[in-house]
C-alpha cells in the first residue's frame, strides 16, 4: 500500500501521495456536484406542453415513432399535435400558434423563421395492379399526367409541387378527384378512380394487403426534404428545446 498521511504528535499530515489523492478527490466531488445540478435542472424542464403543427407527410411517416420514443423519455411533457398543410404550418409558427412546425420544402414565406433539416422522403407513382403503366420500372411526369389523377386538396405542398412540375414542363394534368388524406387517395386508386403520387412511407406498408403497385418517379423533384420551423430558440421553451433536439438527433 501507499501511505497517504504521516502521523505526528500534533496530528496527521498528508504525504505527497496523499496530496495527489486529495486533488483527484476534489475533482471527483466537484464533478458529482455539477452532475447533481444538471440533473436537478433536467428534472425541472422535463415537464410542460409543446405545441406541434405538422403536415400530413410527416405525421404519416415519421412523427409516430419519434413522438413515441420522446414520450417514453419525457412522460411528463405533453405534446399537442395538429395537422395542417405545409403553408398552414408556416403560418401557425409565425403567428405563435405553434412552438414547432414540420413541413415539406418548396413552401414560401419562411423568412424570419429558423429552418432546420428533419427528414427526407421519396415520391412514387401509385397505380392499381391492372393499370397500363404497371409494367414500367420508372416513369417521368409526362408519362403519367395523361391519365386521370387523384390528388390532395389545394394548399398541400405535395400537390403544389406536382402542379408546379406540370406547369414547368408545359403539360396538362387530368385531375379527377381531390381528397384530404393519403388514406383517401389509396382507397380511390385501389377502386380504379385514378392514379396518384404519394410519399413512399405513406404507401409501402399497405402494398401487401392491397391491389396497389408503386413505380419509381425518375425525376429530381421526387426527392423531398422535410423541414422543421421555429421562430427562434427562445420561443419554444425548455420542453420544446428537448423535443427539437430529439427530433434532429
Sequence positions of predicted segments:
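N-terminal winged-helix
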Residues: 37, 43-74, 78-82, 87-91, ...
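Alpha-helical linker/hinge and terminal dimerization helices associated
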Residues: 2, 21-43
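A short LG(V/I)-centered, amphipathic sequence patch enriched
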Residues: 1-14
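A late-sequence structural motif
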Residues: 62, 213-249
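Flexible hinge/capping segments at coil-to-helix
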Residues: 112-149
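Short beta-strand-centered segments that line the small-molecule binding cleft or hinge
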Residues: 23, 27, 42, 65-69, ...
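Hydrophobic hinge/microswitch elements
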Residues: 85-90, 94-98, 104, 157-213
Amino acid at each position: 500500500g501507499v501511505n497517504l498521511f504521516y502521523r505526528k504528535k500534533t496530528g496527521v499530515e498528508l504525504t505527497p501521495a496523499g496530496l495527489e489523492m486529495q486533488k483527484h478527490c476534489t475533482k471527483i466531488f466537484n464533478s458529482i456536484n455539477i452532475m447533481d445540478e444538471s440533473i436537478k435542472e433536467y428534472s425541472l424542464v422535463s415537464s410542460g406542453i409543446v405545441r406541434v403543427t405538422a403536415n400530413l407527410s410527416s405525421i404519416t411517416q415519421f412523427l409516430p415513432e419519434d413522438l413515441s420514443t420522446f414520450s417514453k423519455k419525457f412522460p411528463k411533457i405533453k405534446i399537442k399535435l395538429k395537422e395542417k398543410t405545409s403553408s398552414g404550418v408556416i403560418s401557425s409558427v409565425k403567428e405563435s400558434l405553434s412552438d414547432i412546425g414540420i413541413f415539406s420544402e418548396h413552401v414560401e414565406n419562411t423568412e424570419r423563421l429558423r429552418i432546420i433539416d428533419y427528414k427526407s422522403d421519396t415520391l412514387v407513382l401509385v397505380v392499381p395492379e391492372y393499370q397500363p403503366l404497371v409494367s414500367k420500372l420508372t416513369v417521368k411526369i409526362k408519362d403519367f399526367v395523361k391519365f386521370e389523377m387523384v390528388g390532395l386538396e389545394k394548399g398541400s405542398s405535395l400537390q403544389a409541387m406536382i402542379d408546379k412540375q406540370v406547369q414547368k414542363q408545359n403539360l396538362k394534368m387530368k385531375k379527377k378527384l381531390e381528397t384530404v388524406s393519403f388514406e383517401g387517395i389509396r382507397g380511390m386508386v385501389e377502386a380504379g378512380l385514378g392514379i396518384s403520387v404519394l410519399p413512399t412511407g405513406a404507401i409501402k406498408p399497405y402494398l401487401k394487403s392491397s391491389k396497389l403497385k408503386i413505380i419509381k418517379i425518375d425525376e429530381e423533384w421526387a426527392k423531398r426534404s422535410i423541414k422543421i420551423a421555429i421562430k427562434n430558440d427562445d420561443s419554444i421553451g425548455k420542453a420544446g428545446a428537448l423535443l427539437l433536439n430529439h427530433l434532429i438527433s
